């Protein structure tokens, strides 16, 4: 029997990299069911794509990479959520507006939310009070990388060593 019944891991995955994969694999080992959610269409995403033409940043590329990972596991499902119209007045992402969309996917019995960011804790406590926030490799010791670091790497070969 696994530690948790239902877990969720969401993100933009820009690009999908080894750290993301490690978090998904951790969730898959610990949960009976894992909902992996790709959010796309936020202003920050559009700004990133405008300034960075990497083939790994397109929505299609991210969906393809996630599908290739998820299909290996019986207890994981991929969901795609368009957040284009869910913005605050200043144009920034509105995670609180996204919460009802996530609830449609995971229901009200979410046991655990996965991330590698302790700073997400206040939002997760507010949005999913019944769930544990499981922080995976927050010091990035196993995979010392982030999407932002990868996007800033100029050398394509260096970038590709982190991408799944």
Regions from the language model: what does each represent?
Residues 1-164:
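Nucleotidyltransferase catalytic core that binds NTPs
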């Amino acid at each position: 029997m696994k530690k948790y019944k239902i877990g969720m891991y969401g993100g933009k995955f820009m690009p999908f990299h080894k750290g993301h994969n490690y978090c998904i694999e951790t969730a898959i080992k610990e949960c009976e069911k894992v909902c992996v959610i790709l959010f796309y269409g936020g202003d920050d995403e559009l700004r990133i794509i405008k300034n960075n033409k990497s083939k790994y940043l397109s929505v299609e590329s991210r969906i393809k990479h996630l599908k290739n990972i998820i299909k290996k596991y019986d207890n994981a499902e991929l969901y795609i959520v368009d957040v284009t119209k869910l913005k605050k007045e200043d144009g920034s992402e509105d995670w609180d507006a996204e919460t009802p969309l996530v609830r449609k996917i995971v229901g009200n019995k979410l046991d655990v939310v996965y991330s590698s960011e302790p700073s997400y804790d206040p939002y997760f406590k507010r949005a999913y009070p019944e769930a544990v926030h499981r922080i995976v490799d927050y010091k990035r010791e196993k995979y010392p990388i982030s999407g932002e670091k990868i996007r800033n790497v100029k050398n394509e070969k260096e970038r590709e060593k982190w991408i799944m």
